[in-house]
Amino acid sequence: MAPSDTPPSAEDLPSQGELALFAPPATAEDALVPASMVNAWIYCPRLAVLEWGRGEKARSVDLIAGLRAHQATESGPTPALPDPMVLREDQSLKTRKLSLSSERLGLTAELDLLDVEEGVVIPVEIKVGKRPSVDEGAYLPERAQVCAQALLLREAGYTCLEGALWFAESRERVTVDLTEALVTATLVATSDLRLTVASGRLPPPLDHSAKCPRCSLLPICLPDEIAWFRKGSIARTPPPPASPALPLYGQTPGARIGKKDRGGSVCLDRMAAWLSSRPVPCYAAIGMLNTASGASHPSVARHADGGASARSFRLPTAFRRPVRRSLPCYAAR
């Protein structure tokens, strides 16, 4: 029987397993992967390649907040970290700003803070925000970044058994255990990033991910635009749920807003005569007030109290959020 000229389809080919290949040790000409880029690769491969491989940079609110959190730790001079051959087993100290590199690991890092407890060195990475509510105490990208720092310390000859993350907003410290699984994930991420950058390939953007809106490289990455060209459409964002609350606007010059009684009244009163006589008009929006429950129509019923200096807006129910008494209305042009 003559062989067919038609190439076999993908279904006819035998399945082949994937073999994980690590990148070779870095040389003097190769760029070393920063520990922060290990974090970025696990978080979003496209972000890591754009930043480290292609040099794309953009400032964001989160980035500026992170820089300020790091600067807050620089409150004064600290002793230098002794050489591992000189560091005593009973020695304890705190130090900052240590640079480490390893061609064998293909890694480099700028360590924020180092705790030395009885000769054991603990790298501490400072993060903005609160500690996440996860079993490990932190997400994998942050733990891998600390693990990369710990591996560099071990490579330099220091004893490092664990790492730590400091969350500035919640002021909590989380211990990072250097498990075999975490070390493997860190080395695989380092190798994959080096191989991807060396190949010149740019990973595809994340598919409709919640990570994208706050990313500093969103205008460069263009995930929605690329998804549209690939699929012809993008996933529609679900509309927000309808709220029964209505805004309340106060437009009386020199007025203030406050609760009149427990029944949910809002009183709009004039302040002192000298303030109300100012020429600047006052237009202020006073939050969202729940007026749906117990009301035949979601509107605010107005009741005049007979006085020329005050007006009351009677709500059928109490506030969804309590309004602070004597909340001032600020002038706006």
Swiss-Prot record:
Required cofactor(s): Mg(2+); Mn(2+); Cu(2+); [4Fe-4S] cluster
Superkingdom of the organism of origin: Bacteria
Cofactor binding description: Mg(2+) or Mn(2+) required for ssDNA cleavage activity. Can also utilise Cu(2+). Binds 1 [4Fe-4S] cluster per subunit. It may be important for protein stability, since mutation of the Cys that bind the cofactor leads to a colorless, insoluble protein.
Enzyme class: hydrolase
GO molecular function: 4 iron, 4 sulfur cluster binding; manganese ion binding; single-stranded DNA 5'-3' DNA exonuclease activity
EC number: 3.1.12.1
Residues annotated for Mn(2+) binding in this entry: 70, 112, 125-126
UniProt keyword terms in alphabetical order: 4Fe-4S, Antiviral defense, Exonuclease, Hydrolase, Iron, Iron-sulfur, Manganese, Metal-binding, Nuclease
UniProt binding sites for [4Fe-4S] cluster: 44, 212, 215, 221
Catalytic activity: exonucleolytic cleavage in the 5'- to 3'-direction to yield nucleoside 3'-phosphates
GO biological process, one term: DNA catabolic process
Coiled-coil features, chain-numbered ranges: none
Keyword Cytoplasm: no
This protein's record includes keyword Manganese: yes
Main function: CRISPR (clustered regularly interspaced short palindromic repeat) is an adaptive immune system that provides protection against mobile genetic elements (viruses, transposable elements and conjugative plasmids). CRISPR clusters contain sequences complementary to antecedent mobile elements and target invading nucleic acids. CRISPR clusters are transcribed and processed into CRISPR RNA (crRNA). This may be a 5' to 3' ssDNA exonuclease.
Entry's family note: Belongs to the CRISPR-associated exonuclease Cas4 family.
Protein name: CRISPR-associated exonuclease Cas4
